[in-house]
Amino acid sequence: MEKTLIIATRNSGKTKEFKKLFADFGYEIKDLTDYPELSEIEETGTTFEENARLKAEQIAEITGQVVIGDDSGLCVDVLGGLPGIWSHRFSAPDPTDEKNIAKLLHELAPTAITPERRSAHFHTTLVAAKPGRESLVVEADWDGYIALAPKGENGFGYDPIFMVDAFRTAAELSEKEKNQVSHRGQALRKLMAELPEWLYK
């Protein structure tokens, strides 16, 4: 069985989560930092699946390897699903996690006294690609609310403002807790249920 998978990302936080989640399955995980000669794949899609496919399928063609493309984002209901596929670039032109969070909290300021209007979910689409093979696609969501201010030291991205229950943000969960319930953890378990058969059908 092929035991090396390339994750189509240079995001160290994302790679760390994948390594942790795949460890139980005995896979070696590489990411695009292991392939510095590969140019950046532009995310020109209009959906999570289109972007995940672009990354996975293009890099699979170039490397000849099995590649997992991940496109994830935070979708806030009152903002019509934004930041969505633009989550990582929400505070462009020079986005950082801190600036993305600050912009989102600013956009949600009018809803501060109505927490029920701050409902949101994280979404992940994973695409497994291999040359000459129809890609495998799985998706998952993680429901929650947007906090009034960042809390917690763990995780990355919008985790410090994503309330997973009445008391804690995603950044206050341990790695193990987060991986059991998160959008990426759920999607990965779906992927692992189908990946072995897909690799060899």
From Swiss-Prot:
Keyword Metal-binding belongs to the record: yes
Transmembrane stretches, start-end: none
Cofactor: Mg(2+)
Residues binding substrate: T9, R10, N11, S12, G13, K14, S72, F156, G157, Y158, D159, K178, H183, R184
Family: Belongs to the HAM1 NTPase family.
Self-association state and partner proteins as the record states: Homodimer.
Protein name: dITP/XTP pyrophosphatase
Species of provenance: Lactococcus lactis subsp. lactis (strain IL1403)
Gene designation per UniProt: ynbD
